[in-house]
Amino acid sequence: MGSVSGNTPLKEVDNEIFELMNREKDRQFKGLELIASENFTSRAVMEALGSHFTNKYAEGYPGSRYYGGTEVVDELETLCQKRALKAFRLDESKWGVNVQPYSGSPANFAVYTALLRPHDRIMGLDLPSGGHLTHGYQTDKKKISASSIFFESMPYQIGADGLIDYQRLEENALLFKPKLIISGASAYPREWDYKRMRAIADKVGAYLMCDMAHYSGLVAAQLLDSPFDYCDVVTSTTHKTLRGPRSGIIFFRRGKRVDGNGKEIEEYDIESKINFAVFPSLQGGPHENVIAGVAVALKEADSQEFKEYALQVKKNAAAIGNALMNKGYKLVTNGTDNHLILWDLRPKELTGNKFEKAADIANITVNKNAVHGDTNAISPGGIRIGSSALTSRGLKEADFEKIADFLDRIVSISLEIQGRVGKKLVDFVVEINKSKELLDLRKEVEEFSSKFTLPGI
């Protein structure tokens, strides 16, 4: 009998990749992950991702595939759809769901492909106001996202108070007449007024979409207002607050469409358009191993344990925000309703990218972010901080207050270095890599972080 290939462990087949995996695991274990779009998924999800489902090609949808041997993946995908609807308490006679998008950006573009024609008009939150690239981002000189290249985009913005200016949104919508209005953001710490946005969309005859990628886990836990009460389409990633694998999902209305007075006016025709946009218009075969991971994550999200986790996410975000404000720092909107805070460093005359690089030396991972009034996208004045990942490791409010102390020390060290070498980033980077204070802080951070379990190990 001949030997069967493919059963040799990774360490023997490719030690180079094996070592990189171990280094990354060590980095995650010893460091403090504060990037708001990241999380730690469970071992169960990882097992599904690494399963034999990765071997199966399955173009099409359950019951209508272009390949044979799909009876098991049909069951898998149908189960994932049912779990998605259940996790968000949706009636399948009124909502459907597509679980095939490879990630959040493809999910959003599939919605645009389904509901719009080239050069139709869209309105999403401006990127410097906390929106996402895929919501129509463009600069004065260049169309950046495909959503602004293939469609005409007019963003809405936040006001000086950091809150969405719904009045101006309505005024501009009445003039611009968009076919699609997009709610949801990647760096907005407050609740959304979906009812107000529904009224605006109805006034101009637009679809209302929500991209809840960042906070879908909090919606599932009923800790934020639900976009499903007012939106026609809802998209999400599955790896942020939902704590699943890296994937995308699209929910869409079914049944009768109603006006603002609750009167049925027409039948929704969204489902077939979105399914056709995902496949065959934009994608080929779905990644069934990822869909398996999504299904596991959705089951986990539909549990009391997850609801307790999501509540702790909110508590921890509030705790670190309050701790920073108590130290005299400024937060956009003076706090948060969700999993993230926006920290304005401009009063300290320190840029977000300098702080990010200094924090990296101390093994604390954050990301620079624009805040209202920023004019330089390359060197924004803010930092975005999220609580989801470290909450998955078991950290509580007191732990996040300790992290605020670490962050405060990084500011002090950074300002001292900037005072010596000047404001050029290149000189600052050279100096922080020689900073004994940052290296000493790194040791404290790693000792602190190593006390907490890393999911999936």
Curated annotation (Swiss-Prot):
Keywords linked to the UniProt accession: One-carbon metabolism, Pyridoxal phosphate, Transferase
Cofactor or coenzyme needed: pyridoxal 5'-phosphate
EC number: 2.1.2.1
A cellular component term, taken from the record's GO annotations: phagocytic vesicle
Catalysed transformations (reactions): (6R)-5,10-methylene-5,6,7,8-tetrahydrofolate + glycine + H2O = (6S)-5,6,7,8-tetrahydrofolate + L-serine
Leader peptide range in chain numbering: none
PANTHER family, A to Z: SERINE HYDROXYMETHYLTRANSFERASE, SERINE HYDROXYMETHYLTRANSFERASE 1
GO biological process assignments: glycine biosynthetic process from serine; one-carbon metabolic process; tetrahydrofolate interconversion; tetrahydrofolate metabolic process
InterPro entries: PyrdxlP-dep_Trfase (IPR015424), PyrdxlP-dep_Trfase_major (IPR015421), PyrdxlP-dep_Trfase_small (IPR015422), Ser_HO-MeTrfase (IPR001085), Ser_HO-MeTrfase-like (IPR049943), Ser_HO-MeTrfase_PLP_BS (IPR019798), SHMT-like_dom (IPR039429)
Protein's job: Interconversion of serine and glycine.
A Pfam family reported for this protein in Swiss-Prot or TrEMBL: SHMT
Modified residues (N6-(pyridoxal phosphate)lysine): 240
Pathway: One-carbon metabolism; tetrahydrofolate interconversion
GO terms, molecular function: glycine hydroxymethyltransferase activity; pyridoxal phosphate binding
UniProt superkingdom: Eukaryota
Subunit structure: Homotetramer.
Protein name: Serine hydroxymethyltransferase 1
Disulfide bonds: none
Family to which this protein belongs: Belongs to the SHMT family.
